[in-house]
Amino acid sequence: MKKINVVILALSILFFAASCSKDDPTPEVDQEEVGTAKLIFTEVEREAHGDHAHYNDIQNPEVVTVTFSGADMLPPVGEHLHLEVGKSYRLQLVATDFAGRETQQTFVARADIHQAFILGAPANSLSYEYGDIDANGQALNVGVTGYLTVNALANTFTMNYVLRHLNAGVKGRITAADWNNASYNQFTGENDLDLKVSVHLVAEGDHDH
């Protein structure tokens, strides 16, 4: 009887060890760790089509780029962007990991748990449309690519680009109209990126201050 009990105990230990090895997979390397980030504003032509617009590349576009780095993901000291009233810009996020490899497509690949919000501008001074699409041409509303239109003059303000890593199931409650929702924290999750830069909305050609 004693030998039988020993055998049963040994088998139980083996079964428990096998179960644990199946239940505890090796953690994946986090592909969303960001070392640097850039926001690139490229002037485009906005072509209105009723309730939506097409955005077309133009020759010799104005391009404005700001890079964020360091532990706090800050722009260069004194960085100050000018965007011109009446113009539309393709706003692109380019993110790299700590090895310098681009990682922004990770956010698009996980579109069900990511969405960007663009905050800080005076009311009605900007409008924005998400531009991310999947392989089938379906809109994803992530914000790695989008289109920003400057509607009105505005004194300098702090533009805040927040890329939210949402809890499961939350994205279904968010619409494209929430792009500048100051209460974005109601959409539970954590921020993968929280980028801030000084922006001034100016008349065409007025870049003197």
Tell me the role of every PLM-derived stretch.
Residues 28-29, 78-85, 150-151:
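Short, solvent-exposed beta-strand/turn "edge" segments of beta-rich domains on protein surfaces
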Residues 3-4, 13-42, 209:
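Bacterial Sec-dependent N-terminal signal peptides
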Residues 55-84:
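N-terminal edge beta-strand
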Residues 89-95, 153-181:
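Internal, hydrophobic beta-strand segments that form the core of beta-sheet-rich folds
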Residues 28, 101-153:
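Extended, polar beta-sheet/loop recognition surfaces of beta-rich domains
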Residues 21-28, 45, 97-106:
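Short amphipathic, basic-aromatic surface patches that mediate peripheral association
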Residues 34, 39-41, 45, 52-56, ...:
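A composition-driven surface/loop motif
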Residues 174-209:
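Short beta-strand elements
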